[in-house]
Amino acid sequence: MTYSRKIKVGVVGVGHLGKFHVQQYHNINNVICMGVFDINSKEAHRVSEEYNIKAYGVFEDLVNECDAVSICTPTSTHYVVAKQALLSDCHILIEKPITDNIIKAEDLIKISNEYDKIIQVGHIERFNPALSELNLDNIKPTFIESHRLSPFNIRATDVDVVLDLMIHDIDILLNLVKSDINNIVASGVSALSNKIDMANARIEFTNGCVANLTASRISQKQLRKFRIFENNKYTNIDFLHHSQETYILDKHKPNKQSPHVIVSENQDKYIIYSKSKIKPYNALTLELNNFIDSILNQNKPLVSGYDGLAAIEVAFKILKQINLNNNK
């Protein structure tokens, strides 16, 4: 759909993620990228020169000239930056996690409602093509298992691994399992930082579904897998390689012989394997387009402020259990 109106956007924080936001905004038709702000003025000017946009020396000047901003600053600064942007009448896309504190997240949502502004939270895996292939309406998980492992990076150590990495899988989990949480058992350790670097959480839902989430930022290699078990069905999602495999248990023999059919010994059950052909695309482009479309159409974004709040509520429950175990 073509719109006559163009959204004036800015990017706050031009570190690792912020640079990608600037790059992708330049590819969206309904956007005018006004400029960037970063406390590192040298880096802000470097990005501004690369994309021929303005490097603002004062944060307030940027938000006062924009309709919307991406907030790509450290988590500890999210609340202050986002609040000022909302009060300056800006819609905001705020990188995950929404804040480092539940009360702060609730306050941002309250302000956004008062000013009729959109909050979108950057849980980018929701836009991963491997997840987008799923028909969420037909999924009834009984058990979910996720592993999200990453090599150590000093850049991400301002928060625990639960808020840094596991938060992605918490958000996806809450989107899949529409049920209250009954119990959480969790453990974690610090290894290379003064925060939790490795964590595991078992989450039990009132509808009987159980999830086991593992996250580590001290791995030798990356791994981002999410496994969904249903009655007679298993789905394996690889977020890193954008692939999805499905195994379905069926008592009906397929119409024709297939190399993707596994027959049990007594041949009364068939395991039918399939691997989706997923067309790759840039998830950030889709995320930013969703943000802009939400503004233009006044729609709820795919990942709202409420979704971001729900994710950190569970994350802090997990961290509470970890701290209780570590202090025994």
Task: List each model region and its residues.
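A contiguous active-site-proximal alpha/beta segment in oxidoreductase catalytic domains
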Residues: 99-156
